[in-house]
Each structure stands twice: as C-alpha cells, then as structure tokens.
From Swiss-Prot:
Gene from which this protein is expressed: atpG
Pfam families for this protein: ATP-synt
Record organism: Ehrlichia canis (strain Jake)
Example GO biological process: proton motive force-driven plasma membrane ATP synthesis
Function: Produces ATP from ADP in the presence of a proton gradient across the membrane. The gamma chain is believed to be important in regulating ATPase activity and the flow of protons through the CF(0) complex.
Record keyword Transport present: yes
Bilayer topology annotation: Peripheral membrane protein
Gene3D superfamilies the UniProt entry points to: 3.40.1380.10, ATP synthase, gamma subunit, helix hairpin domain
Protein name per UniProt: ATP synthase gamma chain
Length: 281
C-alpha cells in the first residue's frame, strides 16, 4: 500500500512538471515569433542606412569605418540569463574560448564584454582578468532604444579598440542555430544593389557619415542580439518539447508500474481472503 501511495505521488509530481514544460514551450514559441518580427524590421533599417552610406565616396567611408591595425580586440559575447535552453550557452562558450585562443596565438590583446550572465558565469574563473563588464537582465531589452541605453550603460568606449567583434548564436531556422562572429569595427558596409540616390549633406558628408556610422554599428550589434534571442527561445522551445516527450514516457511507465503494483496488491488480498476462508472450513 505504501508503494502505491509513493507511485501516486510521483505521477502527480511528473504531471505538474509536464504542465510547466508545456507552458514554457508555448511562451518560448510566442517570444520567438515576436523576435523574428523585430529581426525583420531591424534588417530593413540596416539596409536603409547602408544605402545612405553607399551613396557617398567609398574611400571616405572606408576611412570612417576602418583602422589600420587590429592589436587591441574587444569580444562582445551574447548569451542568456536563464537556463533550460539545451546546449545554447555551452555552444557560445566553447566557440568563444576557441576564438580567444586564436587571437592570443596572434599576440592580440583580448577584452571581453558579456550580454547575459550564463556565459559570464561559465568563463569568469578562467578569464576574469579580461572581463570589462557584464550586462545581465537582457530580457528587459524590448526595442532598439533600450538596446542602445543598455550598450551605453556598459561604460565601454568602443572607439578605444582596433577590432570589435560580437559573438552570438545565429538563427537560421527552428532546426539550425550555430555560433557566429560579426565584425563591428572595422566595419565593411554591405552595399545594396538598389538604385542609389544623390544626397546633399550639411555641414559635410563626412560629419554626417561619422554620425551614421555609430548607428550602423549599433544596428549590426542589435541584429546580432535579436539573432541570439531568437536562437535562445528556439532552443528553449525545443528543450521543453523534448521534456514533454520525456514526461509523457515517464507517465506511461509509472502508470504501468502502478497498475502492476495495484494488481499484485489485489491478488495478495484475494489470496489472503481465500486462505482465511479455507482455514475456517
């Protein structure tokens, strides 16, 4: 009887977990859809900035966006604040460590800026001397304005670095996300194939492009952030879907075990009743 009660408690516990994982799966799916919409809008915005930059002298644009040496490198690492998303954070940490090894083999000075706590927690003990800052609570970033404020709150001056690279999990589809690197500084503008319009700039186009360049770099970083967020939600959705399947299998096994135990208990009770009846006769 005690065994049956224990099995019932386990079944109740697994059912509770199953409800939680189902809700988390639905929430992750909804968040993924919202992030995909933001990602599409951000890419359109980036294309418009590219068109403006593309309309001016390429050599001058190159002077604004490029530096001659790449000795001092800043790696901006995108991860998450929460777990329950499969190997999402492990992949970016492994990718980052390999990237750091390659840079240090070329005698580069490497500094780290983290978006999200998970990668920071996993790398702190090994790279504490290279970490400039960590920006937790990335889920509070709801639009580009909040993202800019988030970046400025880091206190890191990107212009002090010869090379700035953002490392993130790129979202290709719901079945494919993988670690990628996007160079921010120096930045090569992807020229649009659309027809170029002629512009007149006040005071000078170099002043205008210098201002636009910061917006372009922030947009590149924002897109990387959205790609990473989409990958996180997708990974969590898949992880919760897998957890749902596992809980379903476990419930089937527990139900079978419970029925067998209950049947054995009933059989034992019947044997005792029959034995008692026969002893009376």
């Amino acid at each position: 009887m005690a065994n049956l009660k224990a099995l019932l408690l386990r079944i109740k516990s697994v059912k509770s977990i199953q409800k939680t994982t189902k809700v988390m799966q639905m929430i992750s799916a909804a968040k993924l859809h919202r992030v995909q919409q933001k990602l599409e809008n951000a890419r359109k915005h980036l294309l418009e900035i590219s068109n403006v930059i593309d309309s001016v002298d390429k050599d001058n644009v190159s002077d604004v966006f490029s530096k001659h040496k790449k000795e001092k490198v800043l790696l901006v690492i995108m991860s998450s604040d929460r777990g329950l998303c499969g190997n999402f954070n492990n992949l970016i940490v492994k990718f980052t460590k390999s990237y750091i090894e390659d840079l240090e083999s070329d005698n580069k000075e490497v500094n780290l800026l983290f978006f999200g706590k998970k990668a920071y927690d996993m790398m702190y003990s090994q790279y504490s001397d290279k970490i400039l800052n960590v920006l937790p609570d990335v889920k509070s970033i709801t639009n580009f304005l909040y993202f800019k404020l988030f970046v400025y709150s880091s206190g890191v001056n990107f212009e002090k670095f010869d090379n700035v690279i953002v490392l993130f999990n790129k979202f290709y589809s719901t079945i494919l996300q993988k670690p990628s690197a996007q160079e921010l500084i120096p930045c090569n503008v992807e020229m649009s194939v659309l027809l170029k319009e002629m512009y007149q700039y006040e005071p000078t186009y170099i002043d205008v492009i210098s201002t636009i360049s910061l917006g372009y770099i922030l947009n590149l970083m924002y897109i990387a952030f959205l790609e990473n967020s989409a990958s996180e939600h997708c990974s969590r959705m898949i992880a919760m879907e897998s957890a749902n399947r596992n809980t379903k299998d476990m419930l089937n096994k527990l139900a079978l075990e419970y029925n067998r135990s209950r049947q054995a208990s009933i059989t034992t009770d019947l044997i005792e009743i029959i034995s008692g009846f026969e002893s009376l006769n």
